[in-house]
């Protein structure tokens, strides 16, 4: 009987201690500069293999992860795939992300060249987001700054790619994932450049709109670089299309006279910002153009372009 008096308090202490340790482990911070990248978990990976991948690619303590995954009973539930960890803040988030059933996830594909509003419409259909809140966030300067982007809005920075997102992701979560993917791909491919990131993305968005074929992007880029170097108007049709209420099959002179800072028929230099979300090929082309003397180009009936060094030659190609 005397022993029983000590057993119950001891068990109570052990229970509370266990709860405390569990809570401490689940809320253990998981955050570092590398969380914005994608990491692939291979099919049939063991807990040990996954823990090593997380420790090698992210700042995750492999031993703490192994304890957490086993304590939650999820050591057999890790799902393979390509993950972005930007929304992960603690060990609980990490375990949930890696063990959530794919039925709780939605696969989305954002194609190159979509405008911000078109991305929002697409996400509303696929994920039932609050489209107004999403767009508001994309224009929220403090939120944009927190993402590491120096721009007035996120036009051009919602990276076109295929994503596997949890259904319960908030609008902020989705934006963070897309911008993180942009930054990762940009920093992996673009070294120091005479243009700023914002200028490169802005030019890339024009190239993305102009080019149907990737192999023409760097040559198209050279035309714009040559015109910028000569202080010529860019006269880029996509910048005019961007400011019109609806896209025109053919631009008329009256369209090119619309007074707007994005209109490169009226204002020299690059427009204030991107006009769509360019893909990595267009971004690379904007940063590293071909070397040429071309100043003009026009599309033929197959979507290819004819390039010229003189306006006279350009007019001839347009006929």
What are these regions, as identified by a protein language model?
Residues 15-19, 36-43, 102, 233-251:
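Short N-terminal secondary-structure initiator segments
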Residues 121, 125-132, 143-319:
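Bacterial extracytoplasmic/cell-wall-associated proteins, especially those involved in peptidoglycan
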Residues 20-186:
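Signal peptide-directed extracytoplasmic domains
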Residues 9-23:
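Hydrophobic membrane-insertion alpha-helices, especially the h-region
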Residues 1-6:
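Positively charged n-region of N-terminal signal peptides that target proteins for export
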